[in-house]
Swiss-Prot record:
One Pfam family in the UniProt entry: Ldh_1_C
Native source species: Pasteurella multocida (strain Pm70)
Membrane-crossing segments per the record: none
Upper classification of the organism: Bacteria, Pseudomonadati, Pseudomonadota, Gammaproteobacteria, Pasteurellales
Subunit structure: Homodimer.
E.C. no: 1.1.1.37
Family statement: Belongs to the LDH/MDH superfamily. MDH type 1 family.
UniProt protein name: Malate dehydrogenase
Length: 311
């Protein structure tokens, strides 16, 4: 199994490389690419960690050597959010970066599963889909927006609030990956009883957690370490699925279009990527209202990505 990380010299990419070197199955290959000349050094650095994962690093304008033979491609390249910016401000820079990298994926490893980390994910996944479609290689089972950060934040905040064991707390998070499009299904958390006064502020905290980190870093970047952990968790689930294990994760994929063309929901992963899109389950009145209210925003985010490629 070969996993390529594009954007491997950045704050997310370096931490992600470390986690994958530690956690990928023995015999895996880890390929690190970034435009920055430091990238082969990042690879040399993590290669000294004693695990049976082979690491290579590539720098420069062309990611082709890093992508050859890749089964999974994780894209974290792009600029980070600064105070006062929202994820849509990132669009102007990151849209072009994602488009260019996906054009290379389409040429070099068109059958790879691709996980998009670069924000704004609601839009960059749509960009990736349209680029792959133009190249004639789009398989909706193999393109994912990595929304796992919303899930790990939800698990952390819920377990703190309800005094639960974090490792055993699971919170489905549906919708998208910014602001009001992030919807944690708190009503589905086992062993947690809720009153109405708790739900709205906790939902808002989960939705705004990225801003919490951006402001706390005081201009020094956005969430990198927690994002890397979230991306590693998703990538490892994807690898397990590709190896034939039965794994369920919430992720932002093209499904049946009931809510929007792309929508984050529970998905069964398997040998072809998405094996099955699972139902949302029962929603509380608060959740149903929040779902209905987000859709216009989510659809507009998606349309922005489609237009970027097709204009």
């Amino acid at each position: 199994m070969k996993v390529a990380v594009l954007g491997a010299a950045g704050g997310i990419g370096q931490a992600l490389a470390l986690l994958l070197k530690l956690q990928l199955p023995a015999g895996s290959e880890l390929s690190l690419y970034d435009i920055a000349p430091v990238t082969p050094g990042v690879a040399a650095d993590v290669s000294h960690i004693p695990t049976a994962v082979k690491v290579q690093g590539f720098a420069g304008e062309d990611p082709t050597p890093a992508l050859q033979g890749a089964d999974v491609v994780l894209i974290s390249a792009g600029v980070a959010r600064k105070p006062g910016m929202d994820r849509s401000d990132l669009f102007n820079i990151n849209a072009g970066i994602v488009r260019n990298l996906i054009e290379k994926v389409a040429q070099v490893c068109p059958k790879a599963c691709v996980g998009i980390i670069t924000n704004p994910v609601n839009t960059t996944v749509a960009i990736a889909a349209e680029v792959l479609k133009k190249a004639g290689v789009y398989d909706k089972r193999k393109l994912f927006g990595v929304t796992t950060l919303d899930i790990i934040r939800s698990e952390t905040f819920v377990s703190e609030l309800k005094n639960l064991e974090p490792a055993r707390t699971t919170v489905p998070v549906i919708g998208g990956h910014s602001g009001v499009t992030i919807l944690p299904l708190l009503s589905q958390v086992q062993y947690a009883e809720w009153n109405d006064a708790e739900i709205a502020p906790l939902t808002k905290r989960i939705q705004n957690a990225g801003t919490e980190v951006v402001e706390a870093k005081a201009g020094g970047g956005s969430a990198t370490l927690s994002m890397a952990q979230a991306a590693a968790r998703f990538a490892l689930s994807l690898v397990k699925g590709l190896n034939g294990e039965n794994v369920v994760e919430c992720t932002y994929v093209e499904g049946d279009g009931k809510y929007a063309r792309f929508f984050a929901q529970p998905v069964r992963l398997g040998k072809e990527g998405v094996e099955e899109i699972l139902p949302l389950g029962s929603l509380s009145a608060f959740e149903q209202h929040a779902l209905d209210a987000m859709l216009e925003t989510l659809r507009a985010d998606i349309e922005l990505g489609e237009k970027f490629v097709n204009q």
